Amino acid sequence: MNTNAMDQYENCPSYGSFDVKSFSDSPIPFTNNNNNNNNNNNNNSICVMPSNYNNKNNNNNNNEKLEPEATLDVLTHALHTLYKSNDSNQRKLAEKWLILFQKQPIAWEFCPRLLLETNIFELQYFGASTLESKLKNEWNECNVEMKSKILNTIVSIIQNSTKLPICCVTRVSVTLTIAVMYTFPEIWRNAIFDIIHLSIKQDINTLSLHDPSQNHFNTDRLLMVLEFLSILPDELKKQDLALCKYSEIQKELKLIIDKIYKFLLSVLFLPINENFEFIKISYKALSAWLKYMLPSNGTMLQSCFEISFTVGQQKVSNNSNGNGNGNNNNNNNRNSIGYPLIDSLALVLEGSSLSIEGQSNGSCYIEAFRYAIEQSLTIFPTFYNEATVMNQDDSKAKPIFNVFVQFISSNNSQLFTTDLIHRCLNLLISFIEIGSRETISLLFYLIDDFKTHTMLVQQDQNILKFFFLKLLNRFLDVSMYPNGKDYCPIENGTNPLSTSQNAQFNGVLCETNIETLLDDDIEQFRSCSSDCLMNIQENDIIPKSTFLKFLIEKLNAFINEKCPHWEQYESILYYIYAFSGGSQDGQLEYVPILLNIIPLIPIKSIPLVRTSIKLIGRYSSFLKTNTDYLAKVVSDLLPALSHAELIGSAASSLLSICVSDKCSTMLWPHFNQILDQIEPILLGPQKSNPSIVLVYKSLLHILHKAPIHELSPLFTRLISPVIPNITDHIPRVKSKDHYNQLLVQLSILYSVNEIIEYDEFATMGANGEFTSPSKHPLYPFFQTTIPIQGQLLKHYKSEFEIIDCITTFYRYMMLYFREIANDFVDEILQQATQSFNQYPIASLLQIISSIIIPKLQPLTITNIKNSISLISNTFINTLKSVILATNNNNKNNDNTNNNDDNNNKNDNNNNNNNNDNDKSNFILDFTITPDITKDYLILITKILKTSPQCIEPNIISTICIYIIYNLTDLTKDKPTTGNCCLFLTNCLSLNNGKLQISDPNGNKVLEQIKNEMNALFESDPKHSYVLVYNILMNICWTPTSIQVTQHFSDVLLSFAIGYPNLLKLHATNILNDPNFIKDKQINPHDKQSFLTNILKSNSTQVDYRSSVRTFSFICNDKE
């Protein structure tokens, strides 16, 4: 903005010196001192709308009448309804009215009234929030006169801020910050000083850091000013205001930054007992400014640290009364701690530490930072020990801890000598050894990113090793199960992981349902801490075996000392488990040691055994080469499967072992023995436990290694009990438990198809057994289970979980047992079709899709054709039924309340009114059932490209018509838009003749489908016109979404290739129509260039998309 334009801001702050008294007393606070005109004070309304005020962003909302009209009483009632009413409909109406009110121009007038003319908190807070929102979103659209009024309003409010609750003061401070960011320094030249002067009774240049008695504050306004100064640097770092000139602000701030620091430091000299809250906020502001911009020289930075340390160590007397404003929330805390500003001091140092790296640090800066670090090393250990050991106060300990984390995170080798780094690390170790779980969690970010901290990585490896082992040792302590819980200790000799192969698990662990899960915060800490140290291990910061060796030695030492606390053993085993993942390089040598010492642990408990079991599952790489250990481990795992608290971990570990090809091969000779031991568990109470599925998978992996002639009887023995468990639930289950049991049994069935593959038995020996798929050992399994699953589909037609299980079974069957499945495809097809027609579910379409392959039997082709016809009819009717039930009323409401985009779409073309009647015959909302739409279109597309003889040609053209006429409604759901556009693109591409099918009959049908598509556009030119019109409208009106625009571009390109003459005819007429997108005010040259580009049918997809995207951007950028 030029200088002449600035002259129009006659009521804005002056650009020269600002008279403090005039600023404080003037009823129009932003009036220049030389201008005594007070006509702007209009009937007590602080912010009166100029007559020519226009808000471009909210034209739509301004056109919508606000009923009832806004008054203080109406606003009070609306807010009371929103927060207090029990009627949800009334709350929604109140919310809608309040949102609409906030977007009205009149809201500017009400904001100061809500803040200053009421004492109702909800009204005041709503006024503050509304003012903030309007300023952030509407400032750039306001004219000069309006901006002047807004600035006057804001300053009038802050002059009266003593009447506001503290949370409202904060919101108004944010508003003031936004106003300053928009106006400083071009419009409001002295904004920072003007605001600071609200809280001092002297010129800022006369403030003294050497003689605080010369400083005089206006404490009534000090809180607002300090809040503003604490918020401004954070908002400047975010840089999220449009059209805000951040570089200009930063340039100007560099000239005055020392005075800002001087003011904030002078506040610290106020008597602490009476001004505690002011001092706290001043520390907060100092921290924020140190993160954003350091003082101009090291001397001021040194003073900042010195004063902060001096004041931060002051002790508050027991009769402290706060700041005089009645805010005594922290008094009790201050009295009990004695040094209440230590955490504030830490906050300042933390802020400064973020500036150590990346600053142009001269020697003066380095000396100031070194002073801060040396002082921190001296004073903080005492306060940290007091906070953690004596008071157990994390709120005080965490900021101190984080100061040193931030210090050593900075890569400033000029500041941090090797000796200084070692001192910081040693101090951190002492903090870690007594720190709480929450406090030492602050190290996670540093450890995660440790490799990037060159200064730390280059330290002596022995020092780093010592540091990380100390850290791990503390992790063990703070991640133990809490003391005092009864976890049912286990008697010696009943451990499921004893080395004796004859050990029995007789239920001594627990007879009652005792919760043995970790607290969430401990579990999360374990996960994060182990991940961090794994990064250290994997990045070779220390030798890979360091942690594992330390843990095993510690475990062995505890065993030798006969430590009586199972929690300590369990914690060690957890971290061994965590470090046993990954590549396991150099770890396998420790496995036999662990397998031998774990049974020697003198005390057992359920959590301890569970962790031991989980650990064993990590060592399949070792077990696959050691038959004896493998047999012992599996034998010891099996008894744990009978215990509800252990079956999950035991089943998971067993599966981890059995998925190893070598382990399952080694276990196959013992299959009968294993099954003998497990069978009572499979048939007992645990059969409804979801973990039992993992047990079946483990056994199937072993059975997978059986010779073909031995497979059938063992498979039958394993799976046959599952069948009655399923048939017992037909027709329907009566309880949730029975329902869950049914899901478990169905999961077992599809595990068979997942693990055992037919292809592995296709090639037999010289005798040529099983040349027919019907003689395969699993053929009877499918003969039995497929009819049962058909019954389940009938009786559980709306149960998604059960349908998904059956779908998974059939899909795996088609994938891995196609030779066998060919005998059952017609039955499976009938089941899926009937079920879909009864209750449409997307996954049922996936079953039919899995059946489609290039070569099918004639009967199967006929059945699929009939199925697709029925499914298509059901699909269309389902969408129509929803439309008939809800769309008529909703559409009328949408047409009334819709945004300008949709209103303009309806007015852009004279012919569009005629299209409405045509569209009414084809109204469908494909986004109502996005999953069904997706799987239906995938199914039809697969048939089109694989076996077109499986579909009636008119189905393709019918679906295309429905999509064409509803293209403009698709954009509310991007995935559905993509699916529909891809289908339409494939269908339109048929005319280019590139799609060919190996089956001659398929090609004939494909030709018929192509003729249907041609006839579709030739019989009625409106169809092709609507296609082109809707595509162009979406391109022009869709917000700049690259993905959506590309979908429409591909449809247009396929139409350009297949039907170039129709595209030229319609696109030319539409784009040359002056009423088309008239409100966009598009340059005719841009329209013509776009038309030329989209008619190039020989363009590549990339070039075509680029042309469409460019025009879409032009259209949407003009809004």
Swiss-Prot record:
Coiled-coil residue windows: none
Recorded family membership: Belongs to the importin beta family.
Chief subcellular location: cytoplasm
Gene Ontology CC terms: cytoplasm; nuclear envelope
Domain (Importin N-terminal) ranges: 94-160
Region (Disordered): 29-64, 890-916
Biased composition (Low complexity): 32-44, 52-63, 890-915
UniProt-recorded name of the protein: Importin-13 homolog B
GO molecular function per UniProt: small GTPase binding
Signal peptide as annotated in the record: none
Subcellular location: Cytoplasm; Nucleus envelope
InterPro entries documented for this protein: ARM-like, ARM-type_fold, Importin-beta_N, Importin_beta-like_NTR
Function: Required for nuclear protein import and mediates docking of import substrate to distinct nucleoporins.
Alphabetized SUPFAM superfamilies for the sequence: ARM repeat
Database matches in Pfam families: IBN_N, TPR_TNPO3_IPO13_3rd
UniProt keywords, alphabetically: Cytoplasm, Nucleus, Protein transport, Repeat, Transport
GO biological process, one term: protein import into nucleus
Positions annotated as HEAT repeat: 223-266, 336-375, 395-434, 503-542, 545-585, 588-625, 632-672, 717-755, 832-851, 852-888, 931-968, 1082-1119
Assembly: Forms a complex with an importin alpha subunit.
